Curated annotation (Swiss-Prot):
<dbReference type="GO" id="GO:0005743">
    <property type="term" value="C:mitochondrial inner membrane"/>
</dbReference>
<keyword id="KW-1278">Translocase</keyword>
<keyword id="KW-0560">Oxidoreductase</keyword>
<keyword id="KW-0496">Mitochondrion</keyword>
<keyword id="KW-0830">Ubiquinone</keyword>
<keyword id="KW-0520">NAD</keyword>
<keyword id="KW-0999">Mitochondrion inner membrane</keyword>
<comment type="subunit">
    <text>Complex I is composed of about 40 different subunits.</text>
</comment>
<keyword id="KW-0472">Membrane</keyword>
<dbReference type="InterPro" id="IPR016813">
    <property type="entry name" value="NADH_Ub_cplx-1_21kDa"/>
</dbReference>
<dbReference type="GO" id="GO:0008137">
    <property type="term" value="F:NADH dehydrogenase (ubiquinone) activity"/>
</dbReference>
<protein>
    <recommendedName>
        <fullName>NADH-ubiquinone oxidoreductase 21.3 kDa subunit</fullName>
        <ecNumber>7.1.1.2</ecNumber>
    </recommendedName>
</protein>
<comment type="function">
    <text>Transfer of electrons from NADH to the respiratory chain. The immediate electron acceptor for the enzyme is believed to be ubiquinone.</text>
</comment>
Length: 201
């Protein structure tokens, strides 16, 4: 048996052509096969489309769809309260925080985390915050400064010290105040003396 297989392989590699009828491909039949062989450059060349019942394992329709258990990964596979934008790691980049006029009016009137107003703690503070945001949406900062311009200016100067906002790279100092990060020269330079370049850390 093995010798016959080897002999067939040798004949094929030696120049013997396998006829189309022995190939496991879908071919035309009847008059269409004669037309194809008449116009084909190589009549023994198949079209390459495999016979589905013989060259598909498992064959189509052989598996019971109810017998297949779809693997579910938690929490990615849980569709309840799991939208794609929450688990999209590719677009999960830092976004800029924007403070509108309504939020600015609420911060000036109610207070912030750094300078909270003690009298507006609890439910009264939450109600006052909602009212301040609604007032900021309708009137904006201009309307707020018309009524309490001097007090708002004093509050802003007390929080910032009369200076503009600090640039990025600020850190909390030892005294509890925000300070810009101090750059220091590295003790071991990353470049040799042939390339005089200072490294900061």
């Amino acid at each position: 048996m093995a010798s016959k297989v080897v002999t067939g392989v040798v004949k094929t590699t030696a120049g013997g052509v396998v006829p189309v009828s022995q190939k496991y491909t879908v071919q035309s039949v009847g008059v269409w096969e004669r037309i194809r062989r008449a116009f084909a450059i190589d009549p023994n060349r198949s079209n390459g489309v495999p016979l589905v019942p013989y060259n598909r394992n498992p064959s189509p329709g052989s598996l019971d769809p109810l017998a297949y258990d779809d693997p579910v990964t938690i929490p990615a596979g849980d569709i309840a309260d799991n939208p794609y934008w929450k688990r999209d790691a590719r677009r999960n980049y830092p976004r800029l925080s924007v403070v509108g006029q309504a939020e600015a009016v609420a911060l000036l009137s109610v207070g912030s985390a750094s300078h909270p107003r003690v009298e507006l703690v609890g439910e009264n503070g939450s109600k006052q915050l909602v009212a301040a945001q609604e007032a900021g949406k309708t009137g904006g900062l201009a309307k707020y400064f018309e009524g309490t311009g001097v007090e708002a200016g004093k509050l802003v100067l007390a929080e910032t010290g009369g200076l503009p906002p600090l640039p990025s790279g600020e850190k909390l100092g030892e005294g509890g105040k925000w300070d810009v990060y101090k750059y220091q020269l590295a003790e071991e330079p990353s470049y040799s003396e042939a390339y005089p370049c200072r490294s900061f850390s």
